[in-house]
Curated annotation (Swiss-Prot):
Belongs to the universal ribosomal protein uL11 family. The gene is rplK. InterPro entries: Ribosomal_uL11, Ribosomal_uL11_bac-typ, Ribosomal_uL11_C, Ribosomal_uL11_C_sf, Ribosomal_uL11_CS, Ribosomal_uL11_N, Ribosomal_uL11_N_sf. Keywords: Methylation, Ribonucleoprotein, Ribosomal protein, RNA-binding, rRNA-binding. PANTHER family: 60S RIBOSOMAL PROTEIN L12, LARGE RIBOSOMAL SUBUNIT PROTEIN UL11M. Part of the ribosomal stalk of the 50S ribosomal subunit. Interacts with L10 and the large rRNA to form the base of the stalk. L10 forms an elongated spine to which L12 dimers bind in a sequential fashion forming a multimeric L10(L12)X complex. NCBIfam families: L11_bact. This is Large ribosomal subunit protein uL11.
Amino acid sequence: MAKKVVAVIKLALNAGKANPAPPVGPALGQHGVNIMMFCKEYNAKTADQAGMVIPVEISVYEDRSFTFVLKTPPASVLIRKAAKIERGSNEPNKKKVGTITTAQLREIAQTKLPDLNANDIDAAMKIVAGTARNMGVTVTD
């Protein structure tokens, strides 16, 4: 018989840098999960993506065991990296802070495709372009 899921925890953590300090410790501790075991497994799986924020969805079972699924990095993080900017604009419709090419946009959309609610690459590109627009980043050919 399958184990019963008692909680699903969603966290966005730096790749390879999960530690028992907040936010990881309190989120997992209240469900009785072995925090160090999670940190070691997460860091091992994300070691090759250092410097990125990797969201994770942790399923906690009634016997206090857990499984986790890694998601793709947020579009905003990928856009900031491609445009080489620290943060998005605080007035995106007035002040533009960077530009990305259509090729970079396609690459980001390709990366995000499994987690987006889109069936093809063009729909994914529109979603990512909207995120870029809201950050004050323009898309050029």
